[in-house]
Amino acid sequence: MKEQKWIHEGLITESLPNGMFRVRLDNEDLILGYVSGKIRRSFIRILPGDRVKIEVSRYDSTRGRIIYRLRNKDSKD
């Protein structure tokens, strides 16, 4: 049986070593996020100020996996 996860949106506030980021969720929680394997393999660059989708386990709500980088409205990428 697959583990149930919550999916939230948030803003990257700080970049940490080894692909870790501090993420402020839309509900104002501050959690630690790490980059998923697909994003790492695709060389998608994540910088502070980016909006992301993050998958949070029900058992440990202080850590999450970044699964998608949302497009910024003002950037040209």
From Swiss-Prot:
InterPro entries: NA-bd_OB-fold, RNA-binding_domain_S1_IF1, S1_domain, TIF_IF1. Keywords: Chloroplast, Initiation factor, Plastid, Protein biosynthesis, RNA-binding, rRNA-binding. It comes from Fouquieria splendens. SMART domains: S1 (SM00316). NCBIfam families: infA. Residues 1-71 form the S1-like domain. GO terms for molecular function: ribosome binding; rRNA binding; translation initiation factor activity. PANTHER family: TRANSLATION INITIATION FACTOR IF-1, CHLOROPLASTIC. Its main location: plastid. This is Translation initiation factor IF-1, chloroplastic. The keyword Kinase does not apply. Pfam families: eIF-1a (PF01176). GO terms for cellular component: chloroplast; cytosol. One of the essential components for the initiation of protein synthesis. Stabilizes the binding of IF-2 and IF-3 on the 30S subunit to which N-formylmethionyl-tRNA(fMet) subsequently binds. Helps modulate mRNA selection, yielding the 30S pre-initiation complex (PIC). Upon addition of the 50S ribosomal subunit IF-1, IF-2 and IF-3 are released leaving the mature 70S translation initiation complex. Gene3D superfamilies: Nucleic acid-binding proteins. Component of the 30S ribosomal translation pre-initiation complex which assembles on the 30S ribosome in the order IF-2 and IF-3, IF-1 and N-formylmethionyl-tRNA(fMet); mRNA recruitment can occur at any time during PIC assembly. Belongs to the IF-1 family. It is found in: Plastid, Chloroplast.
